[in-house]
A protein has these predicted regions:
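Transmembrane alpha-helices and adjacent helix-loop boundaries
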Residues: 1-219
């Protein structure tokens, strides 16, 4: 292990880690919004939209992210829809993540007993108030373990961004290995930076689960 090489490559990995984190978080935020909308559509059994949401979830979950990225990056320009690599990466991650978030939120919503909705309605709440103040907070709390697992999964999936020439962590590692053959040092830095990104998310998720358990949610 050549520590001088590691010190030399460190700035490149820092830049790549920032790109990975920036695009990953952008895709995850969009995925959360898409997932919540799809979950609510399925929960309320909205005609037509429910079938569209179901078809989207099946398509997204049963095709690899790499294929989705290739379709967006190489396929869409053929029909006149052009975009850059960063937008493509965010869109691909959001498309994949939305389906996983939808299933996490849907399971949380469906775990709430119907009697809670009935009780809220009997107290004079309308459907919007019941969902906002009674159902959704509990469903979100119950969904925390699946939500955190999905966030970690999606951040790890950013490693395929290198396939569309985004200079993320994986691209940087492969590029440096190909140029200088410093395989051990490059892979060591790759592991360290992925741990620096993912370990805090995992620890935060565990802490949040414990807090919610003590507060009485998701028991």
């Amino acid at each position: 292990m050549d520590w001088n090489v590691i010190a030399q490559y460190l700035p490149l990995y820092k830049k790549a880690a920032w790109l990975t984190l920036r695009l990953g978080l952008a895709g995850i935020v969009i995925a959360i919004v898409v997932g919540l909308v799809c979950a609510l559509v399925q929960y309320y059994k909205v005609p037509v939209l429910r079938r569209i949401a179901g078809a989207y979830i099946e398509l997204s979950r049963n095709t690899p992210l790499l294929v989705q990225l290739f379709f967006i990056y190489y396929g869409l320009p053929k029909i006149g829809i052009k975009t850059n690599a960063e937008i493509c990466g965010i869109a691909g991650l959001a498309f994949l993540g939305g389906s996983y978030m939808a299933e996490a939120f849907r399971s949380g919503l469906e775990s709430i007993e119907p009697i809670q909705t009935e009780s809220a309605m009997s107290l004079g709440m309308d459907h919007t108030q019941t969902m906002r103040y009674i159902i959704l907070p509990q469903a979100m709390s119950i969904s925390v373990p699946a939500f955190v697992a999905n966030v970690i999964f999606l951040l790890k999936e950013t490693s395929v961004f290198s396939a569309i020439s985004l200079m993320d962590l994986m691209f940087t590692a492969k590029d440096l290995i190909g140029l200088y053959y410093k395989t051990t040092e490059c892979l060591f830095l790759l592991v360290v930076f992925y741990l620096l990104i993912l370990l805090p998310v995992s620890l935060l998720g565990s802490w949040l689960e414990r807090r919610l358990r003590y507060a009485g949610f998701g028991a």
